[in-house]
Amino acid sequence: MALIGNESAHEALAAAMRNGNLHHAWLIAGPEGVGKGMFARAAALRMLAEAAGRDRLAPGWTVPPESQTAHLIEAGAHPDYRELVRLPKDPDKPDEALARSITIAQVRSLQALFATKPSFSPRRVIVIDAIDDLERGGANALLKNLEEPPAGTIFLLVSHAPGRLLPTIRSRCRLLRFEALDDGDVAAILRDQLPDATTGEIAALIKAGE
């Protein structure tokens, strides 16, 4: 799916990547449903593909789906990528209710990764979606990594309510502010997802979501 809307936030991170000024932690903050998690994952894929240097990459965030980096991330097997999200309450029923929080155990599981060097390039990327879901102990454990970031590691932290985060976490991150999508952006997303929908149907869906 194409990245639509919030181009200024996209460009801020892209510029940091081009200029070699990539801070170790980025807080991707804004209302729910505006593409923050999708952008974090697209950015992680692009960062790792660029660092690996094995693919011919066009400008923008796109990475060829046949690239090794894309295949490994899709399979959950990339050694330099981790994603922390709320897990199912019952591991045997992954399609049912999710746990209330991202646990401290999930955060601590990163330590084994940080004890080794990245495998495919000098870079690794951690996505947390959403950091608002961290248990208090998990937030404190993460803070230690943000204060003393492992070499080559980039944290992309999605937040729907950054004001509720520990001030010490916010202070160690560069902010990428995402805004609510306007009707034109919503229409573009709906056309991407529903290519057979008419203009009238798209307009009705936008109206229903107001």
Write out the residue ranges for each language-model feature.
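Clamp-loader machinery-focused feature within the broader ASCE/P-loop NTPase space
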Residues: M1-G137
